[in-house]
């Protein structure tokens, strides 16, 4: 894998994790 692709995958993972965390926090509250 190229470094750029790895960075993109990591960035997407962080965005998805953050989004799910925000949604979960919103639902729990």
Swiss-Prot record:
Ranges annotated as spanning the membrane: 8-28
Subcellular compartments: Virion; Host membrane
Keywords carried by this UniProt record: Host membrane, Membrane, Transmembrane, Transmembrane helix, Virion
Membrane topology per record: Single-pass membrane protein
Source species, domain of life: Viruses
CC annotations in GO: host cell membrane; membrane; virion component
InterPro entries per UniProt: Inovirus_G7P_2
Family under the similarity heading: Belongs to the inovirus G7P protein family.
General function of this protein: May initiate with G9P the virion concomitant assembly-budding process, by interacting with the packaging signal of the viral genome. The assembly-budding takes place at the host inner membrane. In turn, G7P and G9P are present at the end of the filamentous virion that emerges first from the bacterial host.
Protein name: Tail virion protein G7P
Native organism: Enterobacteria phage I2-2
